[in-house]
Amino acid sequence: MKQKILKLLGLATRAGLLVSGEDIVIDALQRKKAKIVFLGNDASSNTLDKFQKKCFFYKVELNTMFTSEELSNSIGRNRMVLAILDEGFHKSIKKCLGGVENEG
């Protein structure tokens, strides 16, 4: 399932529905555009703390299941933090993560 999520991240990048880099992801959170944030599990404790607080405040899921190298390889750029901006990609990723969507 991890590989499928990484492929979805690459597809979202090519579709222009993913942003990467600390400042841009924080901006997406503040503008309430980010649906889910991926942070490399090898990030510094300060970076992890910053994104935990931001994601908690803006009520966005933070996922740290990948290394920054895995995230970078999936999108073709050297990045440690990514945010999905599209609800469709978010739902597909949640399915892969085992999340059950209850709608209604």
Residue ranges and their predicted role:
Residues G16, K35-I36, E61-N63, R79-L82:
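Structural motif
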